[in-house]
Amino acid sequence: MKDINLFKSQPLNTKVLLATAAIYAFVLPVIEIFQAAYIMGQSADMARVVLYQLMVYTGVPITFIFNGFLLRKIAPGWLYSFGMLLGGISMLYMTSLPELTTGGIGIAGLIMGLSFGFFWANRDYLVLVSTTDGNRNYYYGTEAFFNTFAGVVMPIIISTIIVYITHKYVG
C-alpha cells in the first residue's frame, strides 16, 4: 500500500513515463523471442539470428547520431513514441516477406535497432525532464524492477505457452 501511495504521489509525467517503461519492459522480451523464433523457424540457421542481432546493435548508434539532428525539429516525446512504433514495424516487415532472405533479416534487424535507438536516446532525456533530484532514484529503481521482473517472468510465460501449444496442437 505504501508503494502504491508513493506512485500516486508522483507527478503525472513521471507516472506516465513509468507506465510506458513497464509496458515496454513486458513487451520487449516477447518481441525478441518472437523474432529469434521466427527466424529459426523459417530458416533453422543460427547465423541468421546472429546477423539479425548484429544489425540491431548496428542500428542503435546510428540512431543516436540521427536522433541528435532530429531533436532540432521534433520533440523527444514524439521520437520516443516513434521508437516504440518502429519495433512493431520491424516485426511486420519481417513477417510480411515472401521469403526470409539474409537481406530481409538484415533490414528487419536494422529497423529494430533504429527502434531501440530512438527509444533509449529519448527516454533518458524524458526521464531527466520528468523527474526531480528527489524522485529520480525512485523512478530508476522502479523501472529497473520492471525490467528485471519482466526479463525473468516473460520468457517463462512465453516458453510455457509455446510448449502448451506445441503439445496440444502439433503433437
Give the positions of each predicted feature.
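Glycine-rich segments within core transmembrane alpha-helices of 12-TM secondary carriers
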Residues: 140-163
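C-terminal ends and interior cores of transmembrane alpha-helices
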Residues: 85-100
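Helix-loop boundary and gating motifs at the non-cytosolic
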Residues: 2-61
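Intracellular juxtamembrane helix-capping segments at the cytosolic ends
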Residues: 35, 118-132
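Hydrophobic core of transmembrane alpha-helices in multi-pass small-molecule transporters
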Residues: 22, 101-119
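Residue-level signature of mid-helix packing/kink "hotspots" within the transmembrane helices
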Residues: 57-65, 151-152
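Helix-to-loop junctions at the C-terminal end of transmembrane segments
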Residues: 63-76, 162-163
